Amino acid sequence: MNARTPSSMLLPVKTVKRKKETSPVTPPPVAVAPVLIEDEDLNNYMQLAGMGKLRLDQLMYKCDALQAEKRVIESAHLYRQWIEHTEDPQKYLALFNYGSVLQTLGMTDLAEEAYRLCVASEPKLAQAHINLGLVLERKGQNQQALDQWSNVVAQGVVNPSSDKLMEITALNHIGRVYENQKQYEMAEQALRRSLQMDPKQSGVIQHWVHIRQKACMWPVYQSLPNVSANDMLMSTSPLAMLSLHDDPVIQLLSAHAFVGRTYGFKEEFLSKDKHYKHKRIRLGYLSGDLCTHAVGLLMADFLEAHDKSKFEIYAFDYSPEDGTPYRARLKQAFEHFHPVGSLTDREVAELVLANEIDVLIDMHGLSSGARPGICAMHPAPLQGTYLGFIGTTAMPWLDFVVADRQVLPEELTPYFTEKPLYLDGSFLPLNKNMADITPITRAQVGLPEDAFVMAAFGNVYKINEDLLAAWANILKQAPQAVLWLMDDNEKTTAELKRKLNQIGVAAHQVQFSPRTSYQEYLARLQVADVFLDSYPYNCGSTTHDVLNCNLPMVTLSGKTMVSRMGRSMLSALGLHELIANTFSEYVDITLKIANDAEYQKELVKSVKSSMLRKQKNPKLLTASLEKQVQLLIHKNA
């Protein structure tokens, strides 16, 4: 899950107005396909432009009017006609606006050409460099895009009296692209500079904080000029907050602040007073992760287990078509499968309403790819969230959260805006059908054959100072142990190595391996001796994989839903001895396994037998959800 890119980090494509004259330019023409114009007034403008007799201000006025009427292509033709036949000292302004129109139409090659002519004519027009960079980024030319934005930041390009916003925007784009490239140090520097210029950018603070997490820059919260501690806290994304604070109050406040500034709390009630009386309950799933995504990988058995005699199962899906057999299997699990990726939120909501869905389950919550605008219209009488975001969403249009009493005990419910819908056992589905695994040896991944291997393959941003200190404590007391981590990117790996060395961990006790295919990742789990869960953001789908590989997992359970996922699964399997409540217990449990080979073997047997018992009836969890849905409908009838 990745944090959502806020609108404050993006510069909208826009046109510019005429300003003081500069030297004339005569660029070569940039053309789009011809179009038949059946508008006498527009034809008059085209004729004047073709004769070089249309003033620039008249051109801009008419083109703005055409765009307001959604006649964008005709606007592009008028700009082209004027550019080809008119000499004007401010032709670069028309070129910029022409590029903007072409960019809106998705004609990236032509837009690039127009913008390049523009900046060649007026190198200090910051907006042109910004938009040219966006076009180049869209074409996959990231370094060239960065060069354009760097031009804006460079001294002498920006007009200080009017273009401070342009410099901030350029820095934000630079930070965004570097973040996407996992060049976190460069991204952090760009966004830091942006915040020094304007400290009130909550969306930029959000990204800056999460970048520091992903780069293991500790402390994550570092003081910035004119950014208060509270502003920094409340600007942190809910996803980042899950791994920063094991405090349900802070997580609720963070989610509420994020929803307020990103989506707002405006609701519609399309399904108001709707009480359907279908023979079978119509249960809908709204998701963009019905594929080989972490959430999707949990769902196949669960969805296939629905009782079709009592439930009619719908998908409203905007997942990527990855072409895998698993994706095909997920699609087959639904009685009605509606691809909605090309539809607007309103169109999806109206489709849900038209299908008279009784209960709609949003599989995203506040996770990456969420489309909360759909549920905000209340297209179904009852709506809830499941799996995508392990915490409260603070979205008033979601009535319930699917959970269990271990992961969300009643004492935590005051910190949720949703009511808990409790399932029996663990709320995490257990998909028994694993991918085909080709066994590997330790030598193939650079591990010592005789070492006690402790795998910790959670996302790097889930690592924090306290967790790293606990791992170091284990390594110091178990010299035969090796900590096996994921090599997410070169700089973060180097930083983790430096930190471990600084607290006295020998270099040979730490092994990093790069990301790999899902099949190889499962094979790696099978050559480890134990898995160390992260805290306070416990592993979710990874826990499922670990236990399916019969690998014991030590978890640290906390005070929030996300820090109790490991407890949820291990409790359901009867493996209570692997659940720690403090860092001290976490260390002690792991050391006991590391120093007692017989105990380790018994644990492996316990995990295997517990998983086999659980897998004998994969329909239990689905049946539990169905029972709760039936009770919910009856209660709200």
Question: For each predicted feature, which ranges?
Answer:
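Alpha-helical solenoid repeat scaffolds of the TPR/TPR-like class and their adjacent stem/linker regions
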Residues: 1-446, 459, 501-503, 517-527, ...
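Charged active-site motifs of nucleotide-sugar-dependent glycosyltransferases
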Residues: 278-282, 448-454, 481-482
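Short hydrophobic signal-anchor/transmembrane segments that target glycosyltransferases
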Residues: 302-309, 465-479
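Glycosyltransferase donor-sugar binding loop
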Residues: 317-322, 482-495
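Active-site donor-binding acidic/aromatic loop of nucleotide-activated sugar
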Residues: 339-341, 508-517, 535
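Short hydrophobic beta-strand element within catalytic cores of glycosyltransferases
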Residues: 552-561
